[in-house]
């Protein structure tokens, strides 16, 4: 395959390499057609909204590869946030692997195998850049967006497991992108909705937030955080030359790709504007700008970048360095695309599906007290299955109560309703039950759920709480006697719950944070 060099590219073709745009269809629509055929954009970012099934996705990515090669002279980056677990863009027909809950699973090197499984499915579908893993340290229980997307509250554990995910991903030639530099763990604002600040000194940031990135400084790509670090700069890390160039490039010696998080997130869009944010990020040291949604902003960013080249703010020599870096990493993925994607049959591994389920089964953790026991007079209450944060994905089959009703026909199973009527009815009937099993989901952002569960715990000693999103709900509840946790409300976790309640498995997981 003959690929263009930087020297053979036009200015528009070079600038098109700097944008990582999303679009909103399951087919090659007018938005992506315009970007590729008129603006010579060389990359695409896919989401759940682009995915119906594996056959459709392969047809779409094949078309994208063909058109980008035709209009830019080079292969694309087709990227996706395939962290596993709650941040999983592809769900049907492929391996539904776990996210950082692998840190809790009692399976040797589960994180490596997860990275490898995800990469295998991706490369077979023509995707060569995974916006994972999260190397953020899970050290703030009130963080609304990281939480169980992180491996641990221990920076050394995050660094070690992140490295294994990256190595697993490389087995199938998919480039891993560590995020969110210099660290997104210890904040209480979701950067999709506002601008967080991490107000620590340089020593603390280097020793905690930045440590996993320093230990993985050879990762192919690093994504910046839309977070203020006043110790470094007066602008968010994504727009900070001090952070991206002086610290990451020069001080840490990073030679890979620097990506931004989505510039349509409110942390950037509301204060700086999406298109202007793209220009600021490129001038600060970024190579690729993620603009996930809007054609107007995607085009405006390209126009501003062209103006910056023409007026000298973005020297051609600097632009060429960025493009050369991008092309070099694209070419690393080419042998794997040729082996597994171009003109190859589409196939997926049933063994990977079995291993993915086994990892979830082995992550169930008994945090306090005794295991739950079903009797004919057990009441089970499970929460409504909804995505609690913008970054999470909705799954078609996440109704735990519905599944439990089917599996345990004689059991009183109810879906949690956040109403006074529901709460009062349950409280009035507690004496009719031997014990109660309550499922909790992300208590940090569900005040009514916390109040209800605490009322039950106060009135019914024989109660077991099982968290479906990590152990941190533990700190929200009083009078806890029995507490277990899983780490993601996904179809695999639902299957694990069923096995557990049927006494087909015992908890083997271990905590990854201190409670």
Residue positions per predicted region:
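Preference for extracellular/luminal or secreted protein segments
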Residues: 1-40, 275, 279-515
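Second-shell residues forming the walls of enzyme active-site clefts
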Residues: 8-10, 21-22, 28, 49-72, ...
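Catalytic domains of carbohydrate-active enzymes, especially glycoside hydrolases
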Residues: 33-47, 116-129
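Short acidic, glycine-rich surface-loop motifs adjacent to enzyme active sites
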Residues: 35-54, 141-142, 215-234, 432-445
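Short beta-strand elements of ligand-binding domains
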Residues: 75-82, 131, 462-471
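A charged helix-plus-loop insertion that forms the helical arch/lid used to bind
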Residues: 94-107, 150-152
